[in-house]
Amino acid sequence: MAVIDPTRTWQMIEQRLETTSNPRHRQVLSIVLEHMIAEAAPDLDRLMATVSADAVYHFWGNEGDSGPKGHDGVREYYAAFVASKANHLEYKMDRLVVDDHALVTEGDLHMLLPGATAQQMGFPVDDPAADYLYVSRQLIVWPVNEDGLITAEDSYTSGPLEFRKLDRAELPQAYLDRVHA
């Protein structure tokens, strides 16, 4: 059975959209939903259409802020992310807060990593041809400007909660088709 289902990443947002009538909150939820779906596709142009021209991302961890800055920096980040084939993920949200200015999500991020990619990221990989599961706790603040575009993805992460080699049977077919075709 597949260890992740990327479509579950945006289930909580879809559920909130079903019960939210405030137009601005719907706009904020909808742009983050579109962003998540485009990232999973992966469709770089569609993904970048959700990001403002003056975007400034912050990825907070033990080493400080490592997020890309500016639209070009964000585009380069996502192009590399897609090329790494690490976009196969499931963000298991257990909290979602929306207001007129931002969406805040919290949950466990489950990400599939090709062994070579995991090795480049500094993880202890004993087989670069294998596939690995990386799990971390994340809180993400998604500010949205008055035009309805994402101005940042400010994430705070716990670091690895789990990192392990996977059996082929645990990999979703879409991952196998993209990474091992």
Task: State where each predicted segment sits.
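A solvent-exposed, acidic/Ser-Thr-rich amphipathic alpha-helical stretch
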Residues: R26-Q27, L44-A116
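Residue-level detector of alpha-helix boundaries and kinks
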Residues: T20, V32, F59, E63, ...
